[in-house]
Amino acid sequence: MADFMDIEPSSHSAKASQYESSAPASSSLGNSHPNESLDYYIYDYFVKHNFEEAAQAFLRESKIQIPKSSSSTAFSPSNNNAPSPFPPKNSSLASPSKISESISGDRLYNHMSSAPSPNKKEETNVVHANEDISLDKRQSFGSSSLPPSEVSINVPEGFLVEWFNIFWDVFSARVSRVNSTPIQLYDPSTQRQMARPMSNLQASQPVPSSTFSRSAVVPNPSLPLNPSVLQGQVMNNPTIPKGTPSTSIEGAKTSIPPSHAMQNPHNSFPASADRLQKNHPVQSSNFNPYTPAPSITVPPNYIPNTAMMGPSYSSFGDTDPRTYPAGMGPNPTAARNGFYPPTPAQIHQLKAQQQHLQRQSKQMSEPAPINMKSNKDQQLQYVDFRGVGSGADLQKQQWNKSTSAEGLQPNGLVMRNFGDVRHQKLPTSSPPSQHPPVGQIPSQYLPYQAGLKVPGNTPIPVKQVGGMPLQSPLPVSMKPSADDHSRATPTRSVEAPTLPSYAPRHPTQANGSRYMNPSTSRMTPQSPYMQNYYRPHAQMQDQNNMMSYMLSQQKAMEIAKSREMAIQRNTQTLSSGNQPPQQSGPNPNEFSMSMDPANMQQGNHALSDYHMQLMLLEEQNKKRLMMARQEQGTGSLSPQSYMNSRYSVDVGKEHMSMIPNQTAPMIQPNVPVSANSPAQANTPAADSTKSGTIQPTNRNGEGLSYSPHQQFSPSAPQAEKLSRSMSPFVSQQQQLNQPVSNKPDGLTQNKEVTGMPLNKEELTNPAFPQSRTSWMMPQSFDTSSLNAPGAKDSSSFSSLHAQPGKSGIATMGVADNTIRTTERSTFSEIMKDSPSAHASPGAKTSPNASRAPEPTGGTNSISQDTTQSLQMQSNSVNSSSMVDASKSKEKSGGDTSALDSNAKNEPTAAKPISKLEDDALFNDSAGNAFGFSSKTDSNVEMLNDFDFESFLNDAGADSASVYY
């Protein structure tokens, strides 16, 4: 059976009816089982192929019955009657001549090239693959002495061979995908019919190439070779000689290289193929499908694109990767690597590609004209803009005349809308005109280069040239120059378009630093319905942008100038000591000098507003600083004096408790108190000072009262009120420690600022600034002499600041002379820092032996460090003359321990104050319970570092934090 695997008689099935016998089959054959019918066909196969021994053995062992016939050859098997070897006379089988003709027409042959027949005696009846099936050999079928069997399908070679051929065609198509000969015979006929219109089109449009190239035969190497397409291309190409053997059309009908054909001689076609071709109904007279293909059609190194050659075996559900040596494959592994027939989709794709190649070749040989159909819209078909910037007007006119007479081209595209560029296409070739130089943009691209958006509702003037309307890319009378763009005005005209010989650059590209490459920035043609397609609009846009930029620059310069002038005015005002006038309008200083016009154009308002707020805050701080300086120069209130006026009277009127479990007498402000009260050096106030606790006074609705046994509670309303009131000033104590000014009246200034008690001469002296009554602060009085002789236990003064972690009750009472003396002893520090108090910066004062040591144990550190009260009264220094005496004594090396009690921790004996003086100063009043004083309050330079912003913004009853 293996010898017949290469037989491809798929066309036998179509001719099977010609060999069917009309004789009635035997009853045993008609009513027998299919297995018995198969036995009859097997026996028929043995008989027709002269397998006598096999047929006799099979006849003895099988159950078939052969009918007897008198005209049959003598054959009497032992167990069967010999039937007639020929069919009955009434059989409608074809005559041997008809059978021979049909067999030769159907190209039936057996592939039994090497295997001999089992019966070597009848070897002459064997039909080889390369031999012709002649009539003599066909008549030898059935000439053996074996009786023939009566079968329903009686064919010369037997039904078994026919059935196996059909099965093998299906099986090989299922597993191998190899081109078979019937497919190769059928496919060219259909392809030829499909390619006939294409060939006619090619004949009317000759190829411009003067020499034959391989691309004319094989359009795309990635696609499978189509013999009919190649035939049409070669036949319709006038440049190819008819007798060229390398381009012979017979070689285009197979895809097997000659090398493979030589390697597989047994797969070659039979020698009688020309005679079979003559009888085939679908073959042409000049076509030989069995001629080997030349090397130019299929190169030896050609690798087909299997992705485009039909589906793979996996698309049919076949997962078997094995290959089968079958059919017309170039080699045994041709099942996977062979050439597949083109599918209808590939044929359509190849046809479309061929049309594209034709259009492209025509475009390369001829310039693309402007063709217009005479329809209602007069639509623009094709426009080439690549020669408008070179000045070759004469050549363009000649070119338009020559191309306008050719009519509508197949590649012309209709352009309805100027803005719709999705279906537009530029030609691949340019008219015979010079291109603009590199770096120079053609004039028709300037509107796009300038970013101009062109509406699509105004037509462009059209010129009739040679009977064809030509669309002008620019207005006719538009002749711009490099310097004057205003002359490019839109007008309508019917004259021939005159284009400039140069292409002016965009205004932003005057220096040639950057440009748009014409090859990459070529704009597509647009519809005739276009409005304002002129450069002046791009110029107007550029002018508007330039004008806005110049205005923004001018505005920024004006703001900078106004700011500079305002700074100069403020500087002059500060140098003259006058207060600058308040501005009624918007302050130009609030604008930033660094405002970028780009930010203004882009609308970055948040950043500019934030910057303006910062500038406004800075100006406000400067104004506050200038006001503070003016207040110091004119005798206005300082922050300490303001707080003195706020708290001195109220605190002086408060009733303070001294120690726990002891009642203090009620002290009214209008009760006369002796000024010569003895000082209580060892009062219980020292203990309360050591304890570091505080008991704030609560205020009832009926009047002034106190609670001697009430412990300190941070949640007390009055404590919160006092803490909030004192918070902004306690935080500023370290900033106020600056050297004392070296002004001659530094002592007077210190008295004013730090709260030194004034005498009557100073209060009544018009030259002293504090003698003038302020509208914010009434004159306070010194309550240091309120200690009556019987008020020993009620003259204690305690610190306001509580030490955390310690218990006890600290009372607020009338200022004690001992504590006051301790506070006043620190005034010597002012004299040490003052240039007028000592000769050298390193000079120190000697301790005063007459002063008692200060309390050391539990004294609050804030009272010693931050409370810098003047101690002039305790040392009998109550006037400027005494201060001068103290200075002279200090210079002479005398005892100055009274002025520097901080050198030793010894308590100083308090000296009674002679009388009660109403004083608005802070330190020496009964309201000086917080110690808001500094030795540098009179320094003018202190105001430069003073944080007025926090002073003005944080002060108030809502301040919740206390700064220790």
Swiss-Prot record:
GO CC terms in record: cell division site; cytoplasm; nucleus
Keywords: Cell adhesion, Cytoplasm, Nucleus, Phosphoprotein, Transcription, Transcription regulation
Coiled-coil annotated spans: none
Region of interest: Disordered: 1-32, 69-125, 241-273, 476-523, 572-596, 664-914
Location in the cell: Cytoplasm; Nucleus
LisH domain segment(s): 34-66
Top-level lineage group: Eukaryota
Molecular function in Gene Ontology: DNA-binding transcription factor activity, RNA polymerase II-specific; RNA polymerase II cis-regulatory region sequence-specific DNA binding
Swiss-Prot/TrEMBL GO biological process terms: cell adhesion; positive regulation of transcription by RNA polymerase II
KW Nucleus (keyword) present: yes
InterPro entries, alphabetized: LisH (IPR006594)
Biased composition (Polar residues): 93-103, 261-270, 508-523, 664-700, 707-716, 724-752, 767-801, 818-828, 857-868, 894-905
Transmembrane segments annotated in the record for this chain: none
Biased composition (Low complexity): 16-32, 69-83, 575-589, 869-885
Family membership: Belongs to the FLO8 family.
Function, as annotated: Probable transcriptional regulator involved in cell adhesion.
The protein's name: Adhesion defective protein 3
Naturally occurring in which organism (per UniProt): Schizosaccharomyces pombe (strain 972 / ATCC 24843) (Fission yeast)
